[in-house]
Amino acid sequence: MSRNKINIKRKYGLTVKDILDFRDRARAELDTLVNSEELLIELAKKKEKAYDTALVLAERLHEKRTAAAAELERRVKETLEFLDMPKVVFYASINERTEDGKKKLNPIGIDEIEFFISANRGAEPQSIAKIASGGELARIMLALKSVIADKDGIMTVIFDEIDAGVSGKTARKIGIKMRSLSNTSQLLCVTHSAQIASLAHTHYLIKKSDVEGKTESSLTPLDREGRICELSRILGGINVTESQRAAAIDMLSENE
C-alpha cells in the first residue's frame, strides 16, 4: 500500500494537496470533454454577440473617419503647399471591406484606408505607398504628422534626409514646420541641409572614421561654435570662407 502511495505522489504531486488539485483539474477537463458540444455552441453565441458589437462600433468609426477626411485633406494640402508643392492633389480613400457581400472586420475596423497624392499638375494620384522619392515621401509624412500631432500620441518621429532634392528655400520651410512640430513631439532628423540644421534646438555631428582598419561612427553634440563650424562646412564644402561663416552665424542668430 505504501508503495502505491509513493507511486501516486511521484506521478501526481509530492503532497496530498497537489494530488487533490490534480484530481480537480482532471475532473474539469473531463467535464469539458463530455460537454464539449454544448460548450462550443455557447462559445459560438458569445463570439457572434461580440462580433455584432464590434461591427456596430466599427460602423460608427467609419462614419467618423468619413466625416473627418475632408478636413484632413484640406489641412494636409495647405501644409504641402507651404512646403513648396503648389500643385499637389491629396485625398484619403476610405472603403468598407466586404466579403461575400457582408462587412468584414479587420484590426482597424471595417475600413481599408489609403492616401493618394499627386505632386505635379496632370499626374494621376498614386498611393503614398508607391511613391519612390524619399524626400517627397518625408515631406508628405511631415505634413500628415503636423496635422494630427495633437491626436496621434506618437512622441518621437525620425526623418531621414527629408531635404533630398529640395532647394534651400524649401529646406528652410521644412525646418520651420519641423521646429513648430517639435512643440508637441520629439523630432530626430538626419540632414545635409544647413537651413534645416540651423533650426534645430540641439545639433549632433555624425562622423565616420577609420579605427584600426574598421569603420566606426561617432555622435558628437555641438556647442554654438561647433554648430557654426559645421553649418559653415555644409554651406561651403572643403574651403570655408568668411562670408560662409558669417552666413552660418546669421542662420543661428535668427533662430535663437
Which residues does each PLM region occupy?
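SMC-family hinge/dimerization module
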Residues: 67-137
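Loop/turn-to-beta-strand initiation segments
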Residues: 113, 153-155, 182-188
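Conserved D-loop-proximal element of ABC-family nucleotide-binding domains
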Residues: 152, 164-172
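Walker B catalytic acidic pair
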Residues: 160-161
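Extended, charged alpha-helical coiled-coil/arm scaffolds that mediate oligomerization and mechanical coupling
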Residues: 1-83, 87
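C-terminal lobe/lid and adjacent interdomain/linker elements of RecA-like ASCE P-loop ATPase modules
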Residues: 169-256
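GG-anchored amphipathic helix commonly corresponding to the ABC/SMC/Rad50 NBD signature/C-loop
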Residues: 114-115, 119-121, 135-157
